[in-house]
């Protein structure tokens, strides 16, 4: 299920972010060859940051370990001018001192009344007043909902489009901008950013932001240079298809002549679904009308590779469910490293049932109806396999570029056609490819090594999670090939993969490739993050991101391929959330600090590169000016232990928090398997608005089933989604209801997508005992309505687990009737969580005589709810509905009497 993050308007974004399919950005994913550790033997992230002398930061709103307002080390500080501080006036100090005495008295009274909860372990040693909790921000004005929704609080984050130089040059990046003396598209050395006056303009690939073809000027939608920088693949007039996929007309742009020609001269207007360069820059493979084609650059002839593509058969691209739930992209074509073979997925969905999506206000198909039919809805039918329905049948095929043969390789002992998922394809050498196959319920994984030269294959590893712990295998795209290098102590090929060790996800190094027992690179009661690691091949060093310090944090670490010398590359003495990306050759790195303080990004040279370089590329100065204008809530990170499982909690307290006052509490959650909502990222979102402006406490707990807490806590939810997760929300709410500053009669819960399901499931399970209100947006209400690959991973098939599906569905109308009131909102054109879910629930509510709920429907909106101002309307409705709940307005509505 693609997540919809309820932050900074992110509820409007589907659960996974969109990505450009041919992006040249490498985020901790590339094989490196460096001469040393990332920041040097004596250079950790703190030292790296200090060399820039970034100015001091105003303390932000994160409270940890009872110390708030204490300046972080430079690694956590944000560049800003001290002169911008404007709240040190004499009168404020006088008033502050007067208030301090009153606060101390209130503080003593509060602690005298406080109930000790043995099941809660808080990282806050004391309750802080608003000033100490939020620093200068508590003196500002309340947040506005518009400022949250319009992106004013969005953090700017840059991705570096690193590109490999044709002759092995490192530190090259792709720049795309406006027309000018430097050109529209150019390859630039990172060193040119350091001294722009002396540096050249790099290699200009496209001088203008338009291309002339057939007497017309065309505007590029996307551009992808060839590996040798002599040509550019240009997509024009891109039209979105599903979450990641789109179609466009494609052109080959010659850098030398600055002229363009159609990718397929015989079909210049043909809508192409996917195109990608050969590693040798001599050919482009592309999919059109679900068939695969090859265009060599030394000819205008296009070779058709497949001929069976059509309505039910896809070649080289995924269908809806594989794009959504397996690859997270529109790509199912993989060139071999030497450009002699193309691996591609063939998908046959002829047995997959169609689901109709109706559009009442718009024409997504682009077709104009015949006269007299204008008032009928536009209907789009999507092959959507629901739980228990037939899945698409997938096979991996190969194309030999020289012989033009198309073939597949049968490996004995495989899964049946209706029980096979192909989840990952990684070329391991010029002729060998690693393939991961899952069974339908995603609890048995076969790793297969295929040799396309001999057209043979072997199963090199089988992981049976059903037997091991009763859990599931998550789909990953992070397997990394490690080539043999006897001179550097690697006699055999190998690969990195995430393995389960003592109940936690860790990196393992399998060498030789057919070895089923890995060298453990990491271990311990914490987990690595599922992103491809960067590898220094010369020195045998792996760079990775992990949660070693806390599930809510991300730090960068290095470890040798033999599992020794594990080191932190960022400052782990302070709470932090980091990301990192490396240049192709490993000479440069982009370190991104994402929280809890103001995010920043910095480029540096790594020790393998003796030429010093460092540049702060993003400081997010606008956020500093924003936090000085607005009062923001304090964020207090805590732990709660339920059934001997420790869970992460964050409590957002309103500015000027008064410990002797009673506050309503809103719980916000997502809660899907493997997800995370409690983290140390900087975020000002709808929850911040609710706390800052509406004055309510907002609590989030990552319950069982969520990510980075170990498999025991994660996999317990299998087969009965919603039960344990709802219990964790209820038990946490009970603990908060006992707090002296909480109004236990005004506790609500809300969420979107899986969070919408969890909202309803929690209200159903609690039956009004703890929660009185709930707001569910785009909720799943019965897992038999959701797609098969996601659902069966966590629930098994309906045939295997009919009781589990019955229990997980929202079905107890009597229990829902015990709540004061709840709200349901859904887009009618939701192609992810179908509107059918809400309609089915409403039918149950009608049959049960339940009336204590409201429904808001958004015509033609998909899962993100954006169409025709719907995005703003969602949050306006959430906000006003919540105010009515916490001011007892819904009590009056619920007991309304007929006029006499």
Swiss-Prot record:
> Which EC number(s) are documented for this chain?
3.4.14.5
Keyword Protease (UniProt): yes
* Glycan-carrying positions: 150, 195, 348, 410, 514, 639, 644, 812
- What residue ranges are annotated as transmembrane? 91-111
Q: Which InterPro entries match?
A: AB_hydrolase_fold (IPR029058), Peptidase_S9_cat (IPR001375), Peptidase_S9B_N (IPR002469), Serine_Prot_S9B/DPPIV (IPR050278)
Q: Which SUPFAM superfamilies match?
A: alpha/beta-Hydrolases (SSF53474), DPP6 N-terminal domain-like (SSF82171)
Keywords in alphabetical order, please: Aminopeptidase, Glycoprotein, Hydrolase, Membrane, Protease, Serine protease, Signal-anchor, Transmembrane, Transmembrane helix, Vacuole
Compartment list: Vacuole membrane
Membrane topology summary: Single-pass type II membrane protein
Topological domains annotated Vacuolar: 112-900
Gene transcribed to yield this protein:
dapB
GO MF entries: aminopeptidase activity; dipeptidyl-peptidase activity; serine-type peptidase activity
Query: Which protein are we looking at?
Result: Probable dipeptidyl-aminopeptidase B
């Amino acid at each position: 299920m693609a997540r919809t993050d309820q932050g900074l308007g992110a509820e409007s974004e589907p659960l996974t972010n969109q990505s450009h399919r041919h992006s040249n950005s490498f985020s901790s994913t590339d094989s490196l060859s460096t001469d040393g550790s990332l920041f040097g033997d004596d250079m950790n992230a703190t030292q790296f940051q200090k060399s820039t002398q970034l100015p001091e930061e105003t303390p932000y709103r994160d409270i940890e370990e009872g110390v708030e307002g204490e300046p972080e080390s430079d690694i956590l500080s944000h560049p800003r001018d001290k002169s911008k501080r404007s709240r040190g006036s004499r009168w404020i100090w006088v008033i502050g001192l007067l208030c301090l005495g009153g606060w101390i008295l209130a503080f003593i009274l509060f602690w005298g009344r406080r109930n000790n909860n043995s099941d809660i372990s808080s990282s806050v040693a004391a309750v802080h007043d608003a000033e100490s909790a939020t620093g200068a921000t508590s003196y500002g004005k309340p947040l506005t909902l518009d400022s949250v929704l319009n992106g004013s609080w969005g953090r700017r984050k840059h991705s570096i489009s690193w590109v490999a130089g044709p002759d092995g040059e490192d530190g090259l990046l792709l720049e795309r901008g406006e027309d000018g003396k430097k050109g529209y598209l150019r390859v630039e050395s990172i060193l040119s950013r350091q001294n722009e006056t002396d540096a050249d303009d790099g290699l200009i690939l496209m001088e203008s932001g338009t291309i002339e073809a057939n007497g017309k000027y065309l505007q590029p939608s996307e551009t992808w240079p060839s590996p040798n920088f002599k040509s550019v693949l240009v997509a024009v007039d891109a039209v979105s298809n599903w979450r990641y996929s789109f179609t466009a007309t494609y052109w080959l742009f010659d850098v030398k002549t600055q002229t363009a020609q159609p990718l397929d001269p015989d079909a210049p207007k043909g809508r192409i679904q996917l195109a990608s360069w050969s590693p040798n820059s001599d050919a482009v493979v592309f999919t059109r009308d679900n068939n695969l084609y090859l265009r060599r650059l030394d000819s205008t002839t296009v070779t058709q590779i497949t001929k069976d593509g059509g309505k039910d058969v896809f070649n080289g691209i995924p269908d809806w469910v594989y794009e959504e739930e397996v690859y997270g992209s529109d790509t199912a074509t993989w060139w071999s490293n030497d450009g002699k073979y193309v691996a591609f997925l063939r998908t046959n969905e002829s047995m997959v049932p169609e689901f109709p999506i109706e559009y009442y206000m718009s024409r997504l198909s682009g077709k104009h109806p015949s006269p007299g039919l204008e008032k009928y809805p536009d209907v789009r039918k999507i092959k959507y396999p629901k739980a228990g329905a037939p899945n698409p049948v997938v096979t991996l095929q190969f194309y030999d570029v020289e012989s033009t043969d198309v073939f597949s390789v049968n490996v004995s002992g495989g899964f049946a056609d209706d029980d096979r998922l192909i989840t990952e394809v990684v070329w391991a050498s010029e002729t060998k490819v690693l393939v991961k196959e899952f069974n339908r319920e995603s609890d048995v994984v076969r790793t297969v090594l295929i040799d396309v030269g001999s057209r043979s294959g072997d199963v090199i590893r089988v992981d049976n999670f059903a037997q091991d712990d009763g859990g599931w295998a998550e789909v990953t795209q992070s397997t990394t090939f490690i080539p043999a290098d006897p001179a550097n102590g690697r006699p055999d090929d190998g690969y990195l993969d995430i393995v389960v060790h003592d109940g936690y996800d860790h990196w393992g190094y399998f060498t030789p490739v057919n070895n089923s027992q890995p060298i453990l690179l990491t271990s311990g009661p914490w987990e690595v993050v599922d992103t491809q690691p960067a590898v220094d091949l010369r020195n045998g060093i792996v760079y990775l991101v992990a949660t070693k310090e806390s599930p809510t944090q991300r730090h960068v670490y290095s470890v040798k391929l033999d599992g020794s010398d594990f080191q932190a590359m960022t400052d782990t003495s302070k709470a932090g959330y980091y990301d990192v990306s490396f240049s192709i050759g490993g000479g440069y790195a982009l370190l991104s600090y994402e929280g809890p303080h103001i995010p920043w990004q910095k480029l540096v040279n790594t020790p393998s590169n003796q030429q010093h370089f460092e540049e702060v590329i993003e400081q997010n100065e606008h956020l500093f000016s924003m936090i000085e204008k607005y009062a923001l809530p304090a964020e207090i990170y805590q732990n709660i232990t339920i059934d001997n499982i420790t869970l992460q909690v964050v409590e957002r307290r309103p500015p000027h928090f008064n410990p002797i006052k009673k506050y309503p509490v809103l719980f916000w959650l997502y809660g899907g398997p493997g997800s995370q909502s409690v983290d140390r990222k900087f975020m000002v979102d709808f929850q911040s608005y609710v706390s800052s402006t509406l004055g309510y406490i907002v609590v989030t707990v990552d319950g069982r089933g969520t990510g980075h807490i170990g498999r025991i806590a994660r996999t317990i939810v299998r087969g009965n989604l919603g039960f344990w997760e709802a219990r964790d929300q209820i038990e946490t709410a009970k603990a908060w209801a006992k707090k002296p500053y909480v109004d236990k009669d005004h506790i609500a819960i809300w969420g979107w997508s899986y969070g919408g399901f969890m909202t309803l499931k929690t209200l159903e399970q609690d039956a009004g005992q703890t929660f009185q209100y709930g707001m569910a947006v785009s909720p799943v209400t019965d897992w038999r309505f959701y797609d098969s690959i996601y659902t069966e991973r966590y629930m098994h098939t309906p045939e295997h687990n009919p009781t589990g599906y019955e229990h997980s569905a929202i079905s107890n109308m009597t229990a829902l009737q015990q709540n004061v009131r709840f709200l349901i909102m859904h887009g009618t054109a939701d192609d992810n969580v179908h509107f059918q879910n809400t309609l089915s629930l409403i039918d149950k509510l009608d049959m049960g005589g339940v009336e204590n709920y409201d429904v808001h429907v958004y015509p033609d909106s998909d899962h993100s709810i954006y169409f025709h101002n719907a995005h703003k309307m969602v949050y306006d409705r959430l906000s006003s509905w919540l105010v009515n709940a916490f001011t007892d307005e819904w009590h009056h509505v619920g007991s309304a009497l007929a006029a006499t």
